[in-house]
Amino acid sequence: MDKLIITGGPRLDGEIRISGAKNAALPILAATLLADGPVTVGNLPHLHDITTMIELFGRMGIEPVIDEKLAVEIDPRTIKTLVAPYELVKTMRASILVLGPMVARFGEAEVALPGGCAIGSRPVDLHIRGLEAMGAKIEVEGGYIKAKAPEGGLRGAHFFFDTVSVTGTENIMMAAALAKGRSVLQNAAREPEVVDLANFINAMGGKVQGAGTDTITIDGVERLASATYRVMPDRIETGTYLVAAAVTGGRVKVKDTDPTILEAVLEKLKEAGADITTGEDWIELDMHGKRPKAVNLRTAPYPAFPTDMQAQFISLNAIAEGTGAVIETIFENRFMHVYEMHRMGAQIQVEGNTAIVTGVKALKGAPVMATDLRASASLVLSALVAEGDTLIDRIYHIDRGYECIEEKLQMLGAKIRRVPG
């Protein structure tokens, strides 16, 4: 199992390109199943979860064609089996996203109950209830969700999400794209990745309106056609590299990104003392060698502060001037990285869903273990400013969400290398 060794100290300085967003790419790949012709999706990040989704299509009899720039062409007409097997689904929760498209396009689906990150309870009941509202018959047995559309196909429905669910919104929106009549999704997720998926469905000829608000209206169409689409940039990767610059007192310009989808994070970085300038597709952060100031923050659904940036800001607060409170309202069990950071000398007290972080002047390198995707990013950030070497184990978590993290950090001047386990 690979490990990362990071020697702390250097201020980051330079420019990097941001990858496509995994959390947009996965639902968009799932939505290709809705088309009745070949679809090409570009700007895919080179990540394990993307490879798993493409492998899942291969298992279903679809043969994706991948070019050298990692754009993939998928022709769902060649599908041979409507089963998403456990051995693939268990490694990636996003596999549940094929459920809605398969039931809508092919009339049935069998999808294993998902695995993935070990944070909190992420029930799939909203996906099931949404499809049932559209007339699907669903049974959960033997660890599989077995769904069948009614005769004549899914019917449009009004559905209220009693908790905001990004993947739930995406799954039901995809199913509704081919349902008969109008569907209205209320208390829908507003994330930019949901908007990107809606734009993709519309690029194939769908009729989705209101994505980015809490009410999405979908008028079902008879067929969705071939299309070519480019996935949006990854706002969490963008934010992570900006925080990396902030903790090291450095200067970083991130390119091929979108500052408008990161406003809550940019505000907090300004509060921490960063100078930030933006263009249409770039953001530059400069700390001018200063130590950041501690910030208070509370995670909440978009457009508020994203839960996927919480761990990175705990790393920032850990070496900042002052004390900051970080309140996590989205997932339980999302402070697992705190106990690893204690090994590096961080002063963090967890009380329920709040972490009180008192900044110290210096962290100390130590052997630590990644526990989930974003927590592992926070350990990398802490290691960049720690005295001495930090060895990070279980970095397959990092590889699930960050494309070429060590190469990109090396380009900015970090002392980081990957060693085989």
From Swiss-Prot:
Sites where the protein binds UDP-N-acetyl-alpha-D-glucosamine: R93, R122, P123, V124, D125, L126, D308, I330
GO biological process: cell division; cell wall organization; peptidoglycan biosynthetic process; regulation of cell shape; UDP-N-acetylgalactosamine biosynthetic process
Top-level EC class: transferase
UniProt pathway: Cell wall biogenesis; peptidoglycan biosynthesis
Record-level GO cellular component terms: cytoplasm
Gene3D superfamilies linked to this entry: Enolpyruvate transferase domain
One Gene Ontology MF term: UDP-N-acetylglucosamine 1-carboxyvinyltransferase activity
Record has Metal-binding as a keyword: no
Pfam families named among the record's database cross-references: EPSP_synthase
Subcellular location: Cytoplasm
2-(S-cysteinyl)pyruvic acid O-phosphothioketal modifications at: C117
Key words, A-Z: Cell cycle, Cell division, Cell shape, Cell wall biogenesis/degradation, Cytoplasm, Peptidoglycan synthesis, Pyruvate, Transferase
Active-site residue list: C117
Enzyme Commission (EC) number: 2.5.1.7
Annotated phosphoenolpyruvate binding sites: K22, N23
UniProt-listed NCBIfam families: murA (TIGR01072), PRK09369.1 (NF006873)
Annotated family: Belongs to the EPSP synthase family. MurA subfamily.
Function: Cell wall formation. Adds enolpyruvyl to UDP-N-acetylglucosamine.
Record-given protein name: UDP-N-acetylglucosamine 1-carboxyvinyltransferase
Origin organism lineage: Bacteria, Pseudomonadati, Pseudomonadota, Gammaproteobacteria, Pseudomonadales
This protein's encoding gene: murA
